[in-house]
Swiss-Prot record:
Domain FCP1 homology: residue ranges: 1-199
Organism: Frog virus 3 (isolate Goorha)
Pfam families: NIF
Disulfide bond positions: none
Keywords, sorted A to Z: Hydrolase
UniProt GO molecular function: hydrolase activity
Name of the protein in its database record: uncharacterized protein 037R
C-alpha cells in the first residue's frame, strides 16, 4: 500500500534558527545537517534584552530534549522513535511518500536529513502541487502527472484533523508533535504504534476489495 506522510508536527518539529537569535549575517554555528543527540545543548545568540535572552534559553532547553538536525534556516527535532516507525513501515512493504504543506526547498532538506530515500521514498508532494490553502485530499493526486497509483490502495498520515475528516477511511490522524516535555519516548512510541495499527487496518480493507 502507498502511504503519504506529512512532515511538520507529524514526523518532525522545526523552528527557525532566528528564534535562538541567529541571522544570515551571524548564522547558527553548526554545519547544516549536523545531527545533535538529545541532551546536547543548543547554541543561543545573546541579545540586549534579559527577557528575550531568557526566552531563547528556555526554548533551547526544551529543544535539547530531542534528537535534532540543523538545516539551513531551521533546527529540526525528530519525533521520538521515528526511526523505528519508518523501519517498521518499510519492512511491512509500505511504499513511503511525502505530502507536506511546506515549500519544496524546505521539504527537500527534511527528506535529506531523515534519509527517507533509504526507504525507497517515491513521491514528494509540496505546497506548489495542490490548491493553496486547501485540505490535503488524496483525490488531488490524480491531477499530478507523476502520480500513477490507485487511490483505493493509498493512505495518508497527518496531524491535522481536517485531513482525517476529508477522507475518514483513507487517513490516519496523528497527535501533533510539538517538541514539548509531554512528547516522551514512551508516549510517542505508543502513538506511532497506534498509527501503524491504523494503517494495517486500511491496508487490510484494500486487500479485501
Amino acid at each position: 500500500m502507498q502511504v503519504f506522510l506529512d512532515l511538520d508536527e507529524t514526523l518532525i518539529h522545526s523552528i527557525p534558527v532566528s528564534r535562538l537569535g541567529w541571522t544570515k549575517s551571524k548564522p547558527y554555528p553548526v554545519k547544516p545537517f549536523t545531527v545533535q543527540d538529545a541532551g546536547t545543548p543548543l547554541s543561543v545568540m545573546m541579545g540586549s534584552s534579559k527577557a528575550v535572552n531568557d526566552g531563547r534559553k528556555r526554548l533551547a532547553t526544551r529543544l535539547s530534549l530531542f534528537k535534532r538536525t540543523v538545516l539551513t534556516d531551521h533546527i529540526m527535532c525528530w519525533r521520538p522513535t521515528l526511526r523505528t516507525f519508518l523501519n517498521g513501515l518499510f519492512a511491512s512493504g509500505y511504499k513511503i511518500n511525502v505530502w507536506t504543506a511546506a515549500s519544496k526547498p524546505y521539504a527537500l532538506e527534511v527528506v535529506k536529513a531523515l534519509n527517507l530515500k533509504s526507504y525507497g521514498m517515491g513521491l514528494l508532494v509540496t505546497a506548489q502541487d495542490y490548491p493553496k490553502g486547501s485540505v490535503k485530499r488524496l483525490k488531488y493526486l490524480t491531477g499530478l502527472d507523476a502520480v500513477k497509483i490507485p487511490l483505493s490502495n493509498t493512505a495518508i498520515v497527518d496531524d491535522r484533523e481536517e485531513v482525517k475528516r476529508a477522507q475518514p477511511t483513507r487517513a490516519v490522524h496523528i497527535k501533533p508533535f510539538t517538541a514539548s516535555s509531554a512528547n516522551t519516548a514512551c508516549s510517542e512510541s505508543d502513538e506511532l504504534k497506534r498509527v501503524t495499527a491504523s494503517l494495517a487496518i486500511i491496508a487490510g480493507r484494500s486487500r479485501r476489495r
